[in-house]
Amino acid sequence: LIHSNKYYPFDRSRCEKDLQLTIFDPECFKLAADEILTSHPNIQPILYTRAVAPIMSGNRVTGVYVENREGRGAILAKRVIDATGMSFLLRAAGAECVSTCANAPHRQGPILVFFRAGGISEVTPTYRPNVTDVPYGAINLFPTMRDHEYRIEMTRALGDGSSVEDMTRASIECRRQIPEIIEYLRKNWYGCENIYLIDSGNEALPMSLYKLVGRRPVCVNDMLNGVVPEDTIALCGYGIDVHSAEKGGQNYLHYLELGQ
C-alpha cells in the first residue's frame, strides 16, 4: 500500500493529512488472536461468557460475576480490567464515570453500523464532507486488504449508547439505511457503478460512551499543544476523532507542525 499511489494513503480527497491505517483481515485476526491466547501457559480463554456484575470487597473490585450456557458463576482476580467499551463494570462498582455526550440533549450521540462493499474501483475518491443526501453527512470509504473492497462508514442514528432501547432502534435504522446508501453511491459516486453489499456489522457502534474520571483529565489545551504527560505508557499515531452529536464528521481539525 505504501509504495502505490493508487491506494488510500495517498488519496488527497481525505480530510486527514497523510493518514495511514493498519489494515488487517478480520479472519486472519481471529486465527492470530486464538493462537496467541491458547499458546500462553497462563491464559485460559473463556468464550460465550458475559460479565454481569463486579464482586466487591469494600471499594475494591476482586472479581466478576459471569453468566453463560452453564448458568451463573464467579471469577476472582487480583486485577480486573473493564474491556466492555461502556465502562459497565466500572459504573456498577461505583466508580465516577461521565458520558462523552453528557452535554448533548438527552445524552444522545451518534450511533452507526459499518458495512463492507465490493465492486468499487481502486481509484475512487474516498471522502467528501457536507453530503446532505446521506444520513452520515459525508462520503467515507476505507479500503480493505482486497482489491475493489471497502469498509464504509456512512450510516447514522442518534441515541444513548447505554440504553438498550436506543441501541436496538439505532441498529435497525442503520441497517435500513444501508441499501439506500449503496444505491446512492452507485448512481452518484465515481468508481461505485458496480458496487454491491458484502456484509454489515453484527453490532452498532455508539459514539456516546462512558469514560472513567481519572486523577487528571486530558484538556483541550493538552491536545492542541501536544502535551505528553510524564506517566504516559503509549503514544497513538491517529488523531482524536470528534463526532458531532447531531451530524457526521469532526467539528474541528487541528494539525501539528512537523517536529511537534
Region roles according to the model:
Residues 47-48, 60, 67-79, 83-260:
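Flavin (FAD/FMN)-binding glycine-rich loop and adjacent Rossmann-like elements that form
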